[in-house]
């Protein structure tokens, strides 16, 4: 067998009959499988041991040789080789066919490759192959030409003879008629009788004439067919063919069935044909040229690949190894078998019958019928159901053919090659583990024992608890007490991976240090739930064990949860306090006016109270019960840094040093909160809303090492839970208060609604107007009830606390609980004009309950659909971008894109761009950022973090040029500098990072949050597509619904307002021809945009428009943008449009992820003129390949090819990839494989998918070539200390925040310079 790590490419081609016979270990001659009495394989059958190898290790069929010592001997009695039984998984056989058959993939695929090669229509091809028509395979033109005159003379003689015969017959009949009539005359018969005789005589003469004419026509037909006879001509009329064969058999040959196709291919001159086709393409026009282009693709494929087209017609069929199509006995004595065995059996049966018929010399018609049946059975074996009705098994189920085994989700590619099951894994229910550190998880003892079994067994032997591995295994299985101690020792420092399905992004798998726990549930740290999207309502998680030292190192350094605090999509922290923790911290930092022990200033006779010399004193007071943590106090602080403005005021330019004292007016709770933050972090004197907490953690992530951030969020978690418990925030029915003003508010709106109803009944309003008015009224009513509710609730109400702290829920939900539900939609998505007036606290009436179910049901159905759609979108995105890997440090390009930092207002002030976080942030500057005076504020090549952006804004810079993957010039993949900072680590992206997959996950993961619907815009007929469908539409580069025209030129608008349509004409500024857009539906509305004077209004007559500007509401067609404005603009357009959808849902994704996908969509060029290159006109070529080939041609002073950029949807781009393995495992498997085989495609194994399929390490991360050859060798000391390492947590979370000594080096402090 090949070792998977030692080949560089994988080629697929057409197998000839010779290849098939070479692979084979013998011919399968009988359809039998096994003998049902002895259950042993039949000789020469489909499971024959002589062909495929023995069924039991080292044992021949007849039992003469049993034992490994006879290895390699071939038994002289039964002919079976003595070897391992596993060879039955790899040895193939073959069936020698009595007549050739065509391969259905090449004849029936779209387009039919055989048809294109031979220039035959698929319909004609089908007639030939299935014995419905003859085809002429060759004509001896010379001989025919030489003897044409003789043959013509013979034909004339024959025609003359027919005519003479006709004339003689007519003469004789006429005379007989005359005689008959004379006789009747003599007898004096009536005129009636005479007329009858005459009529019958004339009728007979007419028949004679017709018969002769038919014979003459037949001769004419035969002759004209013969004179025009040419190869590849079809003759459907069997009699005509027989006549031709009888008369002129020596001048031509013809046949039917696959044999005739085989003959045509044998005589086919590929080079000559290619030359003819190239000539047609150069000089032809229209349909002829198109057809020649399509044919040349197939012909050139055979010409260039050196494949023999004879492979499309088979003389032998390979039989796959028997273990891959097993026959197993079930418990009832019945057998279950793979469908392939049935299909092979049909082929063998028909083949044997055909051989017998040929030997017997059966009539041609019977033999042909048997050949047709053989062809059909081979078709069914290769691709059942592709032609005609599929062959069915018991219960009318179509049998699964070889093609079906590869196709689809259950096929070989997706089920077994890309989705393998893994050993050293387990799964269990998860429960919360609030006592864990961020990098720990609780692993049930029993599960850990099973997972680490080999390690435990080895260690038991090492420690002399067991004599050998076998007794160690017994000890483990019986769970002896010493096993647990050893287990504790073995799992120390050995990370495990936890995974929760669905794994929508890379944080769905993270590494943790296992802690042994009782019970059978895995304990999960509360802060990682956000990343896993886990909750504890019965979710399950899988555990995997990294085995090798390298795998453990990767798990520990790259995948440990405390190193994955930031989201790869937006670079913002995901490990944030949520729910209870937020409530706890919010409660802790709330200030309550006049609470127990609050600060009171000095009055005449009493001194001031609530003043403390240190936090310790305040805590003692709280413990004594004289001070509330939420009361305002004055306290002297020495270990907490004052806020910036106080620091400047008190400590001047030297700044605050630990130990310097200052007095803060704050609450004890806030002091306690600030003590959780790292030393030297400025004091935060605010109430901790969730957003404020997020901002703090964000800031920590920007400024401190990850290890500090991890420790801090862990402390916040502990504190949050502690204070949430102490706060006693719970929800009970008594907390849901209905506002007392609700009834009077509703009564007043009821009156207004009555008025509208009356107007409607009087006919003053039509139905739509009435509904609109009512919807408006009840929307107002709902808002007012909400307002009343807000005023009525006390500030310390638990529900309000939960909502206001940002822990969960929103005000709308509170209003639904206690106020009123308000308006709901019907199944069409329109508002029902009667609202739900009850709140859930009061209870709904039956009618209200019924109306409410519409929306609820639609929501559930929507969610289910959305999940499937979103998963499919992710799959396509991953497929198109999976080979985008960071390949080099810097591609040295000068190009970049301009991004906005701020907008300058009329009065000169700058308004910060709201989307700066996802556009400019975390990029590399492509050119110096210079202020108006010409000073460099940030130099080229610097990373734009928050401080740099602030510096630019302070210097009044409104836009900067940044590097982008859209302009990266790296051949395959991208360079680190163009990509910029990795969002997940906050550092420049590493070489080998699979940024394509990260991008696909970042876009696909929030897909389920996007809405499904297309929403109606206030009474406009045209739907505006939004949500998930819009994202799909953009990435698939489809023409959008409600497509809006864009200006092709810069110029003045002339607007004609028709009855139902607008007509817009643009008069170009450069005096060219005016561009007219007619039939623009009025329902779509004209576009509102900014005019030169800064005002915003609708497009009107005489306005000036720029090229590419949208003229109507709706979405521009990206293909139009590409045509009018070029590739750069369409890239920016796509990124902007995708971002709009995500922003509408409040999802933050960095532009760079979308750019990675968009770059893949614009990777190809379509060839317009091939020049001196090898490219075919109309073909799609990778841009890098196109440019390289053009450079080569120009260097040889030839004519370069001309091409234009083309925008491909992600599905099409995935299928057009250079890797046939990747494309075949994506979609349309048979089509991809057919194409690849004809072209003799070679897969260079550059992407990730191809390598996963063949089982190599993926060429990303540590699998990239430059790291591939680093082996991990433990040092002597490490070997000795292998099991004596102290626990991880001691050094990881030392109580003060100084870096502790010890074995663990935080990733941030680790220098990688020597590896690069």
UniProtKB/Swiss-Prot annotation:
One of its GO terms (molecular function) is magnesium ion binding. Its EC number is 2.7.7.6. Belongs to the RNA polymerase beta' chain family. It is an enzyme of class 2 (transferase). Its cofactor is Mg(2+); Zn(2+). SMART domains: RPOLA_N. Binds 1 Mg(2+) ion per subunit. This is DNA-directed RNA polymerase subunit beta'. Mg(2+) binds at residues 535, 537, 539. GO terms for cellular component: DNA-directed RNA polymerase complex. The gene is rpoC. It holds the Pfam family RNA_pol_Rpb1_5. DNA-dependent RNA polymerase catalyzes the transcription of DNA into RNA using the four ribonucleoside triphosphates as substrates.
């Amino acid at each position: 067998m090949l070792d998977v790590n030692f080949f560089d490419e994988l080629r697929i081609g057409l197998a000839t009959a010779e290849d098939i016979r070479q692979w084979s270990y013998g011919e399968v001659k009988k359809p039998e499988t096994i003998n049902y009495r002895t259950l042993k394989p039949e000789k020469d059958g489909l499971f024959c041991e002589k062909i495929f190898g023995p069924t039991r290790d080292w044992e021949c069929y007849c039992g003469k040789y049993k034992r490994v010592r006879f290895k390699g001997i071939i038994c002289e009695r039964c002919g079976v080789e003595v070897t391992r039984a596993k060879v039955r998984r790899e040895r193939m056989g073959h069936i020698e066919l009595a007549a050739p058959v065509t391969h259905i993939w090449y004849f029936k695929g779209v387009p039919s490759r055989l048809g294109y090669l031979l220039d035959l229509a698929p319909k004609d091809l089908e007639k030939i192959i299935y014995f419905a028509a003859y085809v002429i395979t060759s004509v001896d033109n010379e001989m025919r030409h030489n003897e044409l005159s003789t043959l013509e003379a013979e034909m004339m003689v024959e025609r003359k003879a027919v005519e003479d015969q006709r004339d003689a017959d007519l003469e004789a009949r006429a005379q007989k008629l005359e005689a008959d009539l004379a006789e009747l005359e003599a007898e004096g018969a009536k005129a009636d009788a005479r007329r009858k005789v005459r009529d019958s005589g004339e009728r007979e003469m007419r028949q004679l004439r017709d018969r002769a004419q038919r014979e003459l026509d037949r001769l004419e037909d035969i002759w004209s067919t013969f004179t025009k006879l040419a190869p590849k001509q079809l003759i459907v009329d069997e009699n005509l063919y027989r006549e031709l064969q009888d008369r002129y058999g020596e001048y031509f040959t013809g046949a039917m069935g696959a044999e005739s196709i085989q003959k045509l291919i044998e005589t086919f001159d590929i080079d000559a044909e290619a030359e003819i086709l190239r000539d047609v393409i150069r000089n032809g026009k229209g349909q002829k040229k198109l057809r020649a282009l399509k044919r040349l693709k197939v012909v050139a494929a055979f010409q260039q690949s050196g494949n023999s087209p004879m492979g499309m017609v088979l003389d032998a069929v390979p039989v796959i190894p028997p273990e891959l199509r097993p026959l197993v006995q079930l418990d009832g004595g019945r057998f279950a078998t793979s469908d392939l065995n049935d299909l092979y059996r049909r082929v063998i049966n028909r083949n044997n019958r055909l051989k017998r018929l040929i030997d017997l010399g059966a009539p041609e018609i019977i033999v042909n019928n048997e050949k047709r049946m053989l062809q059909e059975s081979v078709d069914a074996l290769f691709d059942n159901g592709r032609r005609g009705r599929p062959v069915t098994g018991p219960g009318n189920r179509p049998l699964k053919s070889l093609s079906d085994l590869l196709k689809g989700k259950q096929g070989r590619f997706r089920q077994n090659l890309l989705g393998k099951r893994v050993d050293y894994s387990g799964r269990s229910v998860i429960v919360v583990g609030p006592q864990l550190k961020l990098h720990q998880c609780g692993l049930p003892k029993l599960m850990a024992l099973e997972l680490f079994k080999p390690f435990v067994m080895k260690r038991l032997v090492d420690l002399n608890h067991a004599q050998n591995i076998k007794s160690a295994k017994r000890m483990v299985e019986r769970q002896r007490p010493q096993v647990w101690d050893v287990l504790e020792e073995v799992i120390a420092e050995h990370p495990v991976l936890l995974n929760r399905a669905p794994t929508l992004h890379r944080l769905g798998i993270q590494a943790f240090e296992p802690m042994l726990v009782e019970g059978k549930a895995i304990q999960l740290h509360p802060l990682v739930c956000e990343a896993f999207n886990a909750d504890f309502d019965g979710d399950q998680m899988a555990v995997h064990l990294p085995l090798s030292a390298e795998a453990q190192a990767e798990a520990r350094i790259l995948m440990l949860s405390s190193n994955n605090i930031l989201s790869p999509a937006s670079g913002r922290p995901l490990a944030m306090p949520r729910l209870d923790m937020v409530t706890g911290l919010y409660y802790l930092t709330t200030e309550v006016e006049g609470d127990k022990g609050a600060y009171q200033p000095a009055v005449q006779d009493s001194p001031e109270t609530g003043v403390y010399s240190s936090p310790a004193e305040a805590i003692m007071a709280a413990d004594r019960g004289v001070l509330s943590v939420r009361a305002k106090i004055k306290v002297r602080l020495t270990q907490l840094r004052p806020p910036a403005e106080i620091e400047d005021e008190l400590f001047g330019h030297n700044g605050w040093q630990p130990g310097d004292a200052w007095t803060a007016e704050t609450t004890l709770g806030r002091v306690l909160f600030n003590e959780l933050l790292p030393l030297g972090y400025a004091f935060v004197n605010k109430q901790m809303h969730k957003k404020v907490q997020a901002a703090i953690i964000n800031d920590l992530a920007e400024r401190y090492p990850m290890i500090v951030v991890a420790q801090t969020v862990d402390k916040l978690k502990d504190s949050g839970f502690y204070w949430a418990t102490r706060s006693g925030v719970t929800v009970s029915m008594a907390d849901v208060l209905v506002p007392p003003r609700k009834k009077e508010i509703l009564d007043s709106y009821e009156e207004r609604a009555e008025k509208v109803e009356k107007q409607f009944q009087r006919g003053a309003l039509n139905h739509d107007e009435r509904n609109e008015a009512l919807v408006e009224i009840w929307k107002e009513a709902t808002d007012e009830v909400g307002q009343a509710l807000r005023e009525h609730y006390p500030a310390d109400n638990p529900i309000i606390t939960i909502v206001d702290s940002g822990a969960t829920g929103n005000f709308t939900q509170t209003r639904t609980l206690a106020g009123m539900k308000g308006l709901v939609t019907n199944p069409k998505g329109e508002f029902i004009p009667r609202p739900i007036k009850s709140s859930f606290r009061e209870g709904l009436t039956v009618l209200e309950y019924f109306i409410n179910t519409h929306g609820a049901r639609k929501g559930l159905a929507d969610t289910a659909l959305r999940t499937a759609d979103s998963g499919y979108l992710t799959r396509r995105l991953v497929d198109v971008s999976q080979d985008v890997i960071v390949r080099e440090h810097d591609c040295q390009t000068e190009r970049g894109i301009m991004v906005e930092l701020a907008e300058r207002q009329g009065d000169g002030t700058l308004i910060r761009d709201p989307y700066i976080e996802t556009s400019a942030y975390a990029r590399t500057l492509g050119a110096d950022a210079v202020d108006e005076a010409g000073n460099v504020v940030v130099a080229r090549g610097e990373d734009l973090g928050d401080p740099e952006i602030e510096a630019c804004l302070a210097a009044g810079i409104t836009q900067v040029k940044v590097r982008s993957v859209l302009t990266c010039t790296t051949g395959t993949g991208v360079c680190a500098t163009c990509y910029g900072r990795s969002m997940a680590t906050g550092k420049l992206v590493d070489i080998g990072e699979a940024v394509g997959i990260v991008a696909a996950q970042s876009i696909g993961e929030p897909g389920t949050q996007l809405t499904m619907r297309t929403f109606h815009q206030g009474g406009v007929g045209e739907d505006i597509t939004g949500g998930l469908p819009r994202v799909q539409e953009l990435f698939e580069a489809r023409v959008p619904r409600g497509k809006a025209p864009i200006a092709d030129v810069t110029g003045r608008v002339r607007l004609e307002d028709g009855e139902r349509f607008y007509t817009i004409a643009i008069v170009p500024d450069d005096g060219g021809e005016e561009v007219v857009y007619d039939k623009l539906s009025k329902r779509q509305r004209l576009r509102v945009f900014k005019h030169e004077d800064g005002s915003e209004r609708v497009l009107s007559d005489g306005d000036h428009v720029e090229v590419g500007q949208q003229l109507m509401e709706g979405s521009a067609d990206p293909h139009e943008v590409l045509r009018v404005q070029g590739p750069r603009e369409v890239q920016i357009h796509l990124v902007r449009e995708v971002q709009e959808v995500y922003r509408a849902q409040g999802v933050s994704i960095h532009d760079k992820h979308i750019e990675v996908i968009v770059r893949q969509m614009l990777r190809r060029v379509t060839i317009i003129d091939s020049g001196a290159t090898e490219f075919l006109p109309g073909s799609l070529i990778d841009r890098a390949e196109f440019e390289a080939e053009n450079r080569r041609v120009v260097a040889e002073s030839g004519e370069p090819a001309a091409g234009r950029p083309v925008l491909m949807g992600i599905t099409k781009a995935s299928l057009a990839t250079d890797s046939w393995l990747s494309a075949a495992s994506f979609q349309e498997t048979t089509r991809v494989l057919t194409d690849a085989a004809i072209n003799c495609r070679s897969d260079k194994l550059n992407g990730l998918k191809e390598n996963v399929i063949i089982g190599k390490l993926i060429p990303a991360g540590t699998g990239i070539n430059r790291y591939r050859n680093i082996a991990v060798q433990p040092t002597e000391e490490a070997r000795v200390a292998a099991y004596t390492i102290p626990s991880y947590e001691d050094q990881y979370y030392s109580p003060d925040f100084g870096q502790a000594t010890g074995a663990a080096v935080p990733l941030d402090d680790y220098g990688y310079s020597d590896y690069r």
